Amino acid sequence: MNQELTNNPFNPVAPLKTFDEIKVSLASPERILSWSFGEIKKPETINYRTFKPERDGLFCARIFGPIKDYECLCGKYKRMKYRGVVCEKCGVEVTLQKVRRERMGHIELASPVAHIWFLKSLPSRIGLMLDMTLRDLERVLYFENYVVIEPGLTELTYGQMMTEEEYMDAQDIYGMDAFTANIGAEAIREMLAAIDLEAEADQLRADLKEATGELKPKKIIKRLKVVESFLESGNRPEWMVLTVIPVIPPELRPLVPLDGGRFATSDLNDLYRRVINRNNRLKRLIELRAPDIIVRNEKRMLQESVDALFDNGRRGRVITGANKRPLKSLSDMLKGKQGRFRQNLLGKRVDFSGRSVIVTGPELKLHQCGLPKKMALELFKPFIYSRLEAKGLSSTVKQAKKLVEKERPEVWDILDEVIREHPVMLNRAPTLHRLGIQAFEPVLIEGKAIQLHPLVCSAFNADFDGDQMAVHVPLSLEAQLEARVLMMSTNNVLSPANGAPIIVPSQDMILGLYYTTLEREGMKGEGMVFGSVEEVQHALDAGMVHLHSKITARITQIDENGLEVMKRFDTTPGRIRLGALLPLNAKAPFDLVNRLLRKKEVQQIIDTVYRYCGQKESVIFCDQIMTMGFREAFKAGISFGKDDMLIPDTKWPIVGETRELVKDFEQQYMDGLITQGEKYNKVVDAWSKCNDKVTDAMMGSISASRKDADGSEMEPNSVYMMAHSGARGSVTQMKQLGGMRGLMAKPNGDIIETPIISNFKEGLTVLEYFNSTHGARKGLSDTALKTANSGYLTRRLVDVAQDCIVRMRDCGTESSITAVAAVNDGEVVSSLSERILGRVLAEDVVRPGTDEVLAAAGTLIDERMSDTIEEAGVASARIRSPLTCEAEEGVCAMCYGRDLARGTMVNTGEAVGIIAAQSIGEPGTQLTMRTFHIGGVAQGGQQSFLEASHSGKVVFDNAQTLENDAGEIMVMGRNMKLIIQDDNGEERASHKVGYGTKLFVTEGQKVARGDKLFEWDPYTLPIIAEKSGTAKFVDLVSGIAIKDETDDATGMTQKIVIDWRSATKGNELKPEIILVDADGEPVRNDAGNPVTYPMSVDAVLSIEDQAEVKAGDVVARIPREGAKTKDITGGLPRVAELFEARRPKDHAIIAEIDGYVRYGKDYKNKRRIAIESSEDPDHKVEYMVPKGKHIPVAEGDFVQKGDYIMDGNPAPHDILAIMGVEALADYMIDEVQDVYRLQGVKINDKHIEVIVRQMLQKWEIQESGDTTLLKGEHVDKQEFDQANAKALSKNGRPAKGEPILLGITKASLQTRSFISAASFQETTRVLTEASVQGKKDKLVGLKENVIVGRLIPAGTGGATMKVRRVAQDRDNVVIEARREEAEAAAALAAPVADDMVGGDVFDQPVHHEEESRD
């Protein structure tokens, strides 16, 4: 059992035991004793004089092993030759000191103790097993109440609680032996031991069939789950109460001598000491037959000390040490960021690494980095030693060490040899995505700073203001190979988030390229003609022609057939020099660079070169344009002075106009024509417009081309060049320097009405300066907080998606999703071609109106195909998606499509889940780190009208309009759309037209681009009369339902609807306005219903009681929320909210069926709305809506499945339940993308789909049928299918269930792997659950494998594991055959006495043999 770990003195490493799964379960007392090497009887640790461990104490050498290698405690046996001898004097076995890390001890408890995890971790497992409440349990355990265990023939019941007095009385009444009642953990243990699990389970199932109501079945199901898990796992319930406590090995709770004779010790020793002390005292008290009350108190204290050892602070007071600091218990060792899981198992420190400051290395190639000689010498020491020895320069390691320390010249030569083609990895913290670690070839440099290639800065998000980076050396050949092939910076040109190049010039380089490609009128040498590129260069060098002159030149190009041809171009010398760097390729013509290059264009050029000319060419090209960009920027000498910021002359007139406008608004407000909110909104709008005008004027004057004396065009303004090229700065920043600073936001996001009119060049007034501090300070504090939030979001995403790996080529699924262009407010934000690029088609795409197949099903769409499809005017395509993939584990390659970072089909073994999590999480951090550059300047201004974005013919969809007195057309419909069609009838734009919108166009009218289509009031939502008549107020009682609000400033009064439910008699009221005709009869609408307008809270009435109302008049207005500034601050929590699948506070109510709206009888403070199905009038679905909420549908309206009955954000769960998976996916993708798009961040849809797939893994059981699944349980789709297949094979009823959406935190905690869940959050709860259920971890995901110390089953790790498994199987066959031979031989030989055979030959199961080396 406890054999020595090392079998061979010369091979101290025992053969590795391979395993396929890890099971965790409760330990029985026998199991604990089998681990133990002896009982610990004394609380002493070591003798303070001799520093030797005390015998039978917490560090006892006899139990745990020797302190020095191969030496017993008293020193009688020393050295290897006595290996395995047990010293008869001190009882210590002579062996390695290392065994003190693995040998355990135990403590025999004088009285049983409940394990706090199973007692207090909710739901309490002991409580569920015994069907007792936690309070009752604690009363029994902490000796306050007795519990009846065996009622006998008395009137008592099993599990009844009794106080001490009641117990005495009962004994008097029934006699001493008539019943059994007990107190403390013994009682609980007896009750648990008495449970017959199978009978209990049958009983519970029977109860469940009869149970009615809401809570009862839930409770029974909870108990049944626990009982079942005990049955399946083979655990016994009484093991939740401990009689023996294991003691962990002493080296894991060390006692370290400090200088000065003091000791530092682990808290665990303190906690163990407490337990031993109390246990020994209890033993003694029992021997002395002490009074009950004393013994009980001691037992209670023992229970408390064991609780503290397992989980300090979970119950009662926290036990503190000498310095008032809480002691770290066993649970605390595992929990949290500093616990075992996250600190030591998931993140380890590594050797062969160093760190230093980084500086730029513009003369490096893309695959190189500069490594300081000193660092290289230290990092590559072992390699240098071995080379020195191989070359015969040193005979021993010691000599080699001396040589290296003296830094002899031959050492440097050898260092050069060693680092040749030995890549090193550079890493910059925070590593937000996989491009944060890349491999480079080191180049030795003088100095102490690492040199980094400028082009990889954007991938590392590095700058040279003092950033540090770490260097790591891959040692083994395999590691070097992987670093070279997979991690080399030249292999990471494209970003995994969106497939765009990430190795892109920035700042100086962009400025240089922009300057090079400028074209100016009237420069020297304009109109010259050149025969070749060389001639141009010659003329430039001779100074005959300017870099920016307009010239004509002949340039070599490649035509379609791959032949070289000469073509003439009108261009400039600068562009020709740039064109000379382009690789010769038909797909990369000179036209690519024959234009003014801004950052976007440069990125596009690199993308084109990478796609069509291959990786090698594009890397060389990048290096060349980097060098050129730097050189030209330096030659151009572009700089920035205060006179480069031009303040437009028209600034003050524009500001004056706006001031007049604002005065008007103030006046209107004083006259009571508009409310304060409207005035605020109008003022804010006026100033935003003014700001835009000033900015336009400034940009106009800065970007205007100027001529000098001799008529040649001057260089553009240098600040304009910087911003326009995309090198640095933005229009917003220029506006603040030379226009006006604009409106500022308060910390809560409201906009301050008074803008900052000055700019930084003029200088701010004191008041303006004070106003601008708000935003600036908020920006800084946000940055700090959001970084943490974003990091946490990434961590949750990684955790939920970590086991999503490409496991197969094709899962063969039939289902797919529809891709359409994403349209936002009538403008296409991402085209169909962007959405289908790199995806696999599920169905053929045909040219509209014909049968011509543009792309067949099953093809991977590349750039050419997507362009073809886009040009053909295809509206939508069906594509494969990770959401619909049917692979058992992970996803299949066909459903995923292209690996964005490589531009080819994704490989099996790619960890797409982690890539998705990083792609979504990384920009979150980026954006939050970048909020403050604009300094809190408000970006806002509401749009109140819409102009045609295309010309064409107007078509209405679901039209419902009404003409009012003034002859204006008002929209009365809820889901009306305005569509603009081109001449072929193709839809060019579509806009949702909201209720109350004023239309300027009619059906069939032709509009030109820029025509005004319709306008609306962005600040209030009107309620419009549909018929004429007299208004009559119902229940609008002054003081209860409406209040007259008098504005102090204007003296005008308005009637505002207030929350009437809070008033004493308010609940009966139904405030509304109805229309009556001259006879006082209600006016009826077309459907024959009376025209009523229920009022919602905060509505402002626009008419008086008994007023005449014409059709189309506004009856009341409901204010909309004011304009808030939008930035990722609102965005990051929004993304988290979406992925956590939280229900929004006032969530929209979605219609579940098609049908007609009917208002039902009202409740106290809820309104009842029913939808009567259009197919089956008896089928109704009811909804409750809080009174006072505005309901956008009226009695008798027809609604379609999926329409909103109440406005707000929909809850994603509802979308899933009503509209299905695809609608949910569309919603999630659009919402998440909207947040990122606002920041200009591109993320591919498939990443979001992968995360949503992980959120949809579980099914909720509706009916259990004849399966073992229970109603309300969440199970994996696989388990669900398996259980149903099992039931059907026995001709039983299958279970019914439906997919549910879990938030990412919930989903990570419910993964199959308990190791992964435990390392994520709520460690104790996860482990408690796992051990009760006897869970097995199959080690499928990445985290589990990292934790148990294996290669991850992705990438090369996945392949290695396959090979290993095959080898293992082969070995097993051979070993079996050998064993059978040996057994046969043994049987032939004479029978030998048993004790002659050594006990350790057959001890290890045979299949644990080391893998074969062939």
Swiss-Prot record:
Q: What class of enzyme is it?
A: transferase
Protein name as annotated: DNA-directed RNA polymerase subunit beta'
Instruction: List its EC numbers.
Output: 2.7.7.6
Mind telling me which SMART domains this protein's record contains? Answer: RPOLA_N (SM00663)
UniProt similarity note? Belongs to the RNA polymerase beta' chain family.
Description of how the protein assembles with itself and partners: The RNAP catalytic core consists of 2 alpha, 1 beta, 1 beta' and 1 omega subunit. When a sigma factor is associated with the core the holoenzyme is formed, which can initiate transcription.
Binding sites annotated in the UniProt record for Mg(2+): D463, D465, D467
Which gene underlies this protein? rpoC
- GO process terms (BP): DNA-templated transcription
Entry GO MF terms: DNA binding; DNA-directed RNA polymerase activity; magnesium ion binding; zinc ion binding
* Gene Ontology CC annotations of this record: DNA-directed RNA polymerase complex
Question: Which residues does Zn(2+) 2 bind?
Answer: C811, C885, C892, C895
User: Which cofactor does the UniProt annotation name?
Assistant: Mg(2+); Zn(2+)
Recorded catalytic reaction(s): these are:
RNA(n) + a ribonucleoside 5'-triphosphate = RNA(n+1) + diphosphate
Q: Which Pfam families match?
A: RNA_pol_Rpb1_1, RNA_pol_Rpb1_2, RNA_pol_Rpb1_3, RNA_pol_Rpb1_4, RNA_pol_Rpb1_5
Function of the protein = DNA-dependent RNA polymerase catalyzes the transcription of DNA into RNA using the four ribonucleoside triphosphates as substrates.
- The superkingdom of the source organism is Bacteria
The species is Roseobacter denitrificans (strain ATCC 33942 / OCh 114)
The cofactor note from the UniProt entry for this protein is: Binds 1 Mg(2+) ion per subunit.
Q: What is the lineage of its organism?
A: Bacteria, Pseudomonadati, Pseudomonadota, Alphaproteobacteria, Rhodobacterales
Record: residues binding Zn(2+) 1: C72, C74, C87, C90
